[in-house]
Amino acid sequence: AVDDMIEQLLPLLDDGDILIDGGNSHFPDTIRRTAYVESKGKLYIGTGVSGGEEGALKGPSMMPGGSPAAWESVKPIFQAICAKVEDGSPCCDWVGENGAGHFVKMVHNGIEYGDMQLICEAYQLMRDLLGMNDDEMHEVFAAWNKTELDSYLIEITRDILAYKDTDGQPIVEKILDTAGQKGTCLLYTSDAAD
């Protein structure tokens, strides 16, 4: 789909124009696309974008890579729309040429998947080995969220453990015990093995 879109856009672009891919492209594809688009006289930026729903509202974290000549043009735009840390610094900077932006995003996703697995295992141990109920586990995750473990994933786990359905029962007990994936974790583990 990305390659088809590039083919549709190239005839509409002038030399030196910048094409930006903000999807979860696999970094080898971004390397290939950068070379191809540059061979046509245009510039290509492959940008990892992170932040989900909150990022859409408050600004995402952005990880641009690709054609170095494009960075100075997109930098003020990207750094204006991205999330900011407490001191106002932008959550966006140039990460490197070719597929570097999508590579960093892939590693970011891999770390996030690892964190989610650790949370699942902690939950299972507390529930099945220690016999803790949802309220007790909520308290543990709330305490963890006040330490160096503070994170969005710990926060939402804490919150879901406290949430009750309309009948007063914990909603977590009604959630189907399955998980899906979009394939990005498979790419991460495959590239890590290589």
Where are the predicted features?
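Rossmann-fold dinucleotide-binding core
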Residues: 2-6, 20, 26-138, 146-173
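Short acidic alpha-helix initiation/capping motifs at coil-to-helix transition points
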Residues: 114-117, 180-187
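Conserved short loop/turn motifs at secondary-structure junctions
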Residues: 143, 175-179
